[in-house]
Amino acid sequence: MLKNFFKKKEKEDTNNKNVLIIALLIHAAKIDENYTEDEKKIIKKTIMELNKISSNQADELLKLAEKKEEESNQIVEFTKEIKKYSMEFKLKIIEIIWKIVYSDGTSDNYESNLIRRICGLLYISDKDNGIIKTNVKNLLK
């Protein structure tokens, strides 16, 4: 019985971490006040790939994260979880955010500023951010 408790607790902790990370992606998608279906698709695909879960499970996490994003008023809450991961993972998150931003073909000042702030909180250099941004732009052409 105790073993089941810890397994359940571990699963809840993992879901909470995922929800915070996904909420950051949603926040990036909403920053231009235009949360599109294309952005949702990118986020959902990311959820499924990173967590190796089904479409239905991804939908559940997406709903939880959307609620979390609506309740929060600062990105620090979302980035504090990502700080615990490797630099490689952090860079991957920035890449995903740029893909979300450029899903509509352009980037505005609010989106660029948000990504700069996220990079600062995650200790990602302007150089690395610029390289990722350029790579994503070239990939989506």
Identify the role of each PLM range:
Residues 1-141:
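Small-residue-enriched hydrophobic alpha-helices in membranes
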